């Protein structure tokens, strides 16, 4: 009897092999990648149904053959799949069960939608992925990203461009500074080692000469901007802190520029005097003693001397220090050594007055045991210009370190006269003299004094010291500061400076009284002869038309001189009145028939009066009228 297939299938359970059982294992891909909340929920439901069916099949295979399918299928919800080889009770609940999916879904915490958020227009999937930390590109985000990236690129390009411009500007400024500093330093030797390039020279291992350390606001606004082309303060400090830390002391010689001494930790000493000038003679031994005291404290100590350029004033004081320390026996050797060390061409200390003061200090060392002798007081009598061409007729100013002692522009008798009027031709050819008639001298001097000749072709001047200078001093043109800068030549030009003691009206005469009287009696004849000679010599005449234009004045001068020398009772002015004499206020006296002096008021002197008085050789007599002057 044939059985019905339908009945047989309902009566006998279906046999399911292990191959037919599909037990999916959880993986990272299964957990992490979720496409959409709706689709994810649908897939979870389908997986749950398939899992229940699979469990049911497994359960049927494990049931005995005699069992029937009378138990309801709803009990399969409590069955949890487990891996093969393990008991169902020991395995944890699977995430693919309903309870596992519920707990897995609860682990996600979604924030509430903020209506004010800018991403409210985003899709649900985009918001979901953003909550999971998966920033997937969208059209809006691409636009925002493009704008941000473009802004970033523009900002980066601008920043790079700005940095390049700043770097190039700094490089250009640095190059300009280096160029300017080399131009300003000119022929001076520079210290160029390692990272340093400074206007600085080691004269010895312990004596350094350098330019002014500028660039600090404490030295004033001009000193601050000088840092662009001079040694910069920061670089100088860095150099000494690197090479001579706690072993250096700075000596500032500038009177026109100071700075905060604390920048050098207070190790700064100031010995100021003006540029292109000489110091008070007492300042030199004080400087040398201070430097020596610092050097002997430690063998590694160094002294750093500077003025503005670090050449002339610095050279004067360093050369004197070399003499003080017995490096050299003579001033010439010390000056030559310093010049070779400081400058490439050996022209550092070149001003004649400053060289003269180094020689003064040599005399102080050798003759006065290093101590400056007391100041000698004397009277400046006048000047004589020898081999003087007509184009040299300077105004005169006498001064010291604090005051102006005499000036032809301010003196009562000369302030209204031009230089060509108060410089008087002497009987000797090419000689002009200057003195104040009727006065003991131009001014009283003591110690250092400066003679400044102000001429249209260029000023020239010199510094002297009464204690270390003779009463009669002859200086060549090359002995004056600034004379070499004049355009017009003056070969053989000399200046004789005549000083007298305060208690004497005239210096000691080199000729006898009889010779002097003979010279005075022949002054009118010499004056007449000089007149005829000067007509043929344009070099020593004031102008081409002077002789003709002033012939009447010369005639008056000769007559006045003759009358002053041929009276029956001559009252020649061999000596000007002393200052303590009541007649000191008289400018000049003349002869009269009664033999008495008639004073001429000071304010009555005119150009013709000065020239008339100048014809009398005794007024401008320095005691050597017979002396001849030869051109060098």
From Swiss-Prot:
Species of the source: Arabidopsis thaliana
Official protein name in the record: Phosphatidylinositol 3,4,5-trisphosphate 3-phosphatase and protein-tyrosine-phosphatase PTEN2B
Bias-annotated ranges (Acidic residues): 535-549
Protein purpose: Protein tyrosine phosphatase that also exhibits a weak lipid phosphatase activity towards PtdIns(3)P.
Location of the region described as Disordered in the Swiss-Prot/TrEMBL record: 1-98, 504-603
Family matches, as PANTHER family: PHOSPHATASE WITH HOMOLOGY TO TENSIN (PTHR12305), PHOSPHATIDYLINOSITOL 3,4,5-TRISPHOSPHATE 3-PHOSPHATASE AND PROTEIN-TYROSINE-PHOSPHATASE PTEN2B (PTHR12305:SF87)
One term of GO molecular function: phosphatidylinositol-3,4,5-trisphosphate 3-phosphatase activity
Tissues of expression: Expressed, at low levels, in seedlings, roots, stems, leaves, flowers and siliques. However, at protein level, not observed in older leaves, flowers and siliques.
Location of the active site: 307
Keyword Protein biosynthesis: no
Stimuli inducing this protein: Accumulates in response to salt (e.g. NaCl) and osmotic stresses (e.g. mannitol).
Cited CDD domains: PTP_PTEN (cd14509)
Residue ranges occupied by any Phosphatase tensin-type domain in the UniProt entry: 189-368
Family according to the record: Belongs to the PTEN phosphatase protein family.
UniProt domain C2 tensin-type: residue ranges: 375-502
Composition bias, Low complexity: 87-98, 505-527, 584-594
Gene it is expressed from: PTEN2B
Residues with Phosphoserine modification: 541
SMART domains for this protein: PTEN_C2
Biased composition (Basic and acidic residues): 39-48
EC code: 3.1.3.48, 3.1.3.67
